[in-house]
Amino acid sequence: MLPPYFLFKEMTDTHYIGRFAPSPSGELHFGSLIAALGSYLQARARQGRWLVRIEDIDPPREVPGAAETILRQLEHYGLYWDGDVLWQSQRHHAYREALAWLHEQGLSYYCTCTRARIQSIGGIYDGHCRDLHHGPDNAAVRIRQQHPVTQFTDLLRGIIHADEKLAREDFIIHRRDGLFAYNLAVVVDDHFQGVSEIVRGADLIEPTVRQISLYQLFGWKVPDYIHLPLALNPQGAKLSKQNHAPALPKGDPRPVLIAALHFLGQQVETHWQDFSVEQILQSAVKNWTLTAVPESAIVNSTFSNASC
């Protein structure tokens, strides 16, 4: 028995659909732009749709006003999306239905293990609560892994092998604090939106096998995956909101777009200063070459706003 059709959209549309799904934990930075631009160019080069989803399911990590700022930043850099923005904060009903279905099928269970206990056994959950039949009080919900996914094909990097212990772990899909886990929400929403290919940063390679295992449990078609290289700051650390990466400049977006295109290994117009943002992006779509994107997970190339 598959999840109800009215809630989970079947991927019958063979047209390309890509997406960019930022969390509102801060403004977009250069690393965010690489992911947004790469997914945008891949979608447009395939004559496909490019969607934007705001992943606002973790209120403690959210910065007030960041979501709207992110949307304005995308517009400032010429990255206009198709259709309406999907907000995960408005999708709780879908996640609850997904949790209920998994529970009814015996594919999940309640777990009361603390983080301290799991760390004491090496950091990988050992299935301690799998057959203890706990109730929901003060408990997280874990997936009951039956056919772990230990590898997947990345269209840029080839076959990627996962850590076997991590791949076999019964991971959390609903947190003890009542929040929905990222892996559950992203799979439910990517399927609901009909996303056919996921283009994102290489920092999300690790959870991919878990997400694929969820697709398989639900009986859904698995999308293709492309993981783009990550940018470093001048100190050699990954650009991220946690590392206080500077927000994208609010001035002329063209030099930053050109820097992002260079980072992605793409051909750039020699006299780009004579081009508008729209013209730069049109040229980038026309010349987009996935095989030119560096395959390494982290590119030893630094960026700072001062360089623009």
UniProtKB/Swiss-Prot annotation:
Species of provenance: Escherichia coli O6:H1 (strain CFT073 / ATCC 700928 / UPEC)
InterPro entries: Glu-Q_tRNA(Asp)_Synthase (IPR022380), Glu/Gln-tRNA-synth (IPR000924), Glu/Gln-tRNA-synth_Ib_cat-dom (IPR020058), GluQ/Sye (IPR049940), Rossmann-like_a/b/a_fold (IPR014729)
Keywords: Aminoacyl-tRNA synthetase, ATP-binding, Ligase, Metal-binding, Nucleotide-binding, Zinc
Protein name in UniProt: Glutamyl-Q tRNA(Asp) synthetase
Record note on cofactor: Binds 1 zinc ion per subunit.
One cellular-component annotation, GO: cytosol
Pfam family, one: tRNA-synt_1c
Binding site for Zn(2+): 111, 113, 125, 129
Family the entry assigns: Belongs to the class-I aminoacyl-tRNA synthetase family. GluQ subfamily.
Sequence positions that bind ATP: 241
Cofactor or coenzyme needed: Zn(2+)
Residues given in the record as L-glutamate binding sites: 19-23, 55, 182, 200
NCBIfam families to which the protein is assigned, alphabetical: PRK05710.1-1, PRK05710.1-3, queuosine_YadB
GO molecular function terms noted in the UniProt entry: ATP binding; glutamate-tRNA ligase activity; zinc ion binding
EC number: 6.1.1.-
Short sequence motif 'KMSKS' region: positions: 238-242
Motif ('HIGH' region): 22-32
Entry function: Catalyzes the tRNA-independent activation of glutamate in presence of ATP and the subsequent transfer of glutamate onto a tRNA(Asp). Glutamate is transferred on the 2-amino-5-(4,5-dihydroxy-2-cyclopenten-1-yl) moiety of the queuosine in the wobble position of the QUC anticodon.
HAMAP family according to UniProt: Glu_Q_tRNA_synth
Example GO BP: tRNA modification
Coiled coil: none
